[in-house]
């Protein structure tokens, strides 16, 4: 497998519960390396822009409200097969369906407060990384 980069987000429901370190440790223990990280408080405009792909979905308003309710940690992760590896360690979107030992099984409160987001493909990883980081902020 090739070394690749992916985007990872620790959502407000997790940062409010002081889980940033625990979640980052799970990612690093899975073999991923943090090459960029910053804590942001998303504006409504940023949340709507980042999640624009979901704008016509019934949960969009609730998603934007949740993402603007507290600080978020946005990160770029690097490693062999980073996109798939991150998806695996995050677990299923619905924590009730997530595998034991995954971030969502361990830390998520509900499907709406599922603690993390991660890119699902190389194209979305590139877009999501570019949304939050300049090239000079990524130090690998």
Curated annotation (Swiss-Prot):
It is found in: Cytoplasm. GO terms for molecular function: ATP binding; metal ion binding; nucleoside diphosphate kinase activity. One of its GO terms (cellular component) is cytoplasm. Its EC number is 2.7.4.6. InterPro entries: NDK-like_dom, NDK-like_dom_sf, Nucleoside_diP_kinase, Nucleoside_diP_kinase_AS. Its cofactor is Mg(2+). Keywords: ATP-binding, Cytoplasm, Kinase, Magnesium, Metal-binding, Nucleotide metabolism, Nucleotide-binding, Phosphoprotein, Transferase. Its main location: cytoplasm. NCBIfam families: PRK00668.1. Homotetramer. This is Nucleoside diphosphate kinase. It comes from Rhizobium etli (strain ATCC 51251 / DSM 11541 / JCM 21823 / NBRC 15573 / CFN 42).
């Amino acid at each position: 497998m090739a070394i690749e980069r992916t985007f990872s987000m620790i959502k407000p429901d997790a940062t409010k519960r002081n889980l940033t370190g625990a979640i980052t440790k799970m990612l690093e223990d899975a073999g991923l390396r943090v090459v960029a990280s910053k804590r942001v408080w998303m504006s409504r405009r940023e949340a709507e822009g980042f999640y624009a792909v979901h704008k016509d979905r019934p949960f969009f308003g609730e998603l934007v409200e949740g993402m603007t309710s507290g600080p978020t940690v946005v990160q770029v992760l690097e490693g062999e097969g980073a996109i798939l590896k991150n998806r695996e360690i995050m677990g299923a979107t619905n924590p009730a369906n997530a595998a034991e030992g995954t971030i969502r099984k361990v830390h998520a409160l509900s499907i709406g407060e599922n603690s993390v987001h991660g890119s699902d493909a190389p194209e979305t990883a590139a877009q999501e990384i570019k949304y939050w980081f300049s090239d000079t902020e990524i130090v690998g």
